[in-house]
From Swiss-Prot:
Mg(2+) 2 binds at E269, N271. It catalyses: 2 D-alanine + ATP = D-alanyl-D-alanine + ADP + phosphate + H(+). It is found in: Cytoplasm. This is D-alanine--D-alanine ligase. Signal peptide: none annotated. Mg(2+) 1 binds at D256, E269.
Length: 308
C-alpha cells in the first residue's frame, strides 16, 4: 500500500512558463496513472490563486508536474513548504540550483565532473557577442541559463548564426550561456532516490536534439540500454548519481550528457522535474526495467515530503 493511499493528492501542472504545454501533458498523464493506482487525485493548473485552491481542495500532498520557471525553480516548492504540504521532487534550493545552468555548471565542476568549456554573458550584451569572445571558437551551443526543454537553444556552426542565436537566447530567462560543442553520443540517465536506473541513448533525426525533437513523436530514435561500452555506461551513471547528490536533489531526476568518443561523460544539466509524457525518457527507462508508468508515478509520490 502506498504511503499516501486515502489522502487527497493534487497534481500541480500547467503554470506560466514557456514549458506550459509540456507540463499540461505531464500532469494529465501522471494524474491518470495515480488514479489507476487508486489515489484520490485533483488536477490543479497553477495560477496566482493556487494557494487558495490548495486550501479549498483540502490537499494533503502535492505531486509536482510543472516544468520551467515558477515550477521547477523552487518557487512552487517554497509555497508548499510555507503551507506545510508535502510534495514530490527536490526542495527549494536544489530546484533553484538545477534550474540555473550557470550555478549548476559551477557545482558540477566543483564535483570534478566533466563540463564543456563555456562563457556566460549578461542578457544586455547578447547583441554584441562575437566569435572573438569565444576562446573555444565554433561550433558552439547557445542557450539561456534559466530555461529547460531546449527552449531557446541553438547549435551554431557559422559566425553569421551567432548573433541571432544569442539574441533569441536573451529573450528567455537568465543570462546567455555559450559553450563548446562536444561531438559525441547524447545520453540521458534517470536517477530515482539517488540511484541511477539506466542510461538511454538519443539519436535525433536532425543533428540537434531540440524542443521539436524532444516532444514530437517519431522524430527521434531511442536505444535502451545505450549502445556504449559497459565502462562508458558505468561512468555516465556514476556521474549522474554524483550530480544528483551534489545539487541535493530528491525523488526522480534526469541527468543529460554528451559522451565523447573517449568515453568522457560531459554533463549538460540536471532536470529536477523531468518530463513524464508518452515520449519522455524517464518512463522509457523505467519501462525497460519492468516498472510500469503507474508504478513509477506511485514510487515518486511515495517520496513526497517537506524538505526545509
Amino acid at each position: 500500500m502506498s504511503t499516501w493511499t486515502g489522502k487527497r493528492v493534487a497534481v500541480l501542472y500547467g503554470g506560466r512558463s514557456s514549458e506550459r504545454e509540456v507540463s499540461l501533458r505531464t500532469g494529465a498523464a501522471c494524474a491518470d496513472a495515480l488514479r489507476q493506482k487508486g489515489h484520490d487525485v485533483v488536477l490543479l493548473d497553477v495560477d496566482l490563486e493556487v494557494a487558495a485552491r490548495l486550501r479549498a481542495e483540502r490537499v494533503e500532498v502535492a505531486f509536482v508536474a510543472l516544468h520551467g520557471r515558477f515550477g521547477e525553480d523552487g518557487s512552487i516548492q517554497g509555497l508548499l513548504e510555507s503551507m506545510a504540504i508535502p510534495y514530490t521532487g527536490s526542495g527549494v534550493l536544489a530546484s533553484a540550483m538545477g534550474m540555473d545552468k550557470t550555478v549548476s555548471k559551477a557545482i558540477f565542476r566543483s564535483l570534478g565532473l566533466a563540463v564543456a568549456d563555456y562563457r556566460v554573458f549578461p542578457r544586455a550584451s547578447a547583441g554584441s557577442i562575437g566569435v572573438g569572445d569565444l576562446p573555444f571558437g565554433l561550433p558552439c551551443v547557445v542557450k539561456p541559463a534559466g530555461e529547460g526543454s531546449s527552449v531557446g537553444v541553438h547549435l551554431v556552426n557559422e559566425a553569421a548564426e551567432l548573433g541571432p542565436a544569442c539574441r533569441d537566447a536573451a529573450s528567455h530567462a537568465g543570462d546567455v550561456i555559450v559553450e563548446r560543442y562536444v561531438k559525441g553520443t547524447e545520453v540521458d540517465v534517470a536517477v530515482l532516490d539517488g540511484k541511477a536506473l539506466g542510461a538511454i541513448e538519443i539519436v535525433p533525426a536532425n543533428a540537434f536534439y531540440d524542443y521539436a525533437a524532444k516532444y514530437t513523436a517519431g522524430t527521434t530514435k531511442y536505444f535502451y540500454p545505450a549502445r556504449l561500452p559497459e565502462a562508458h555506461v558505468r561512468a555516465v551513471m556514476e556521474a549522474a548519481e554524483a550530480a544528483h547528490r551534489g545539487i541535493g536533489c530528491s525523488g526522480v531526476t534526469r541527468v543529460d550528457f554528451i559522451v565523447a568518443g573517449d568515453g568522457t561523460p560531459y554533463i549538460l544539466e540536471v532536470n529536477t522535474l523531468p518530463g513524464m509524457t508518452a515520449t519522455s525518457l524517464v518512463p522509457k527507462i523505467a519501462a525497460g526495467l519492468g516498472l510500469s508508468f503507474p508504478d513509477l508515478c506511485e514510487r515518486i509520490l511515495d517520496g513526497a515530503a517537506l524538505k526545509a
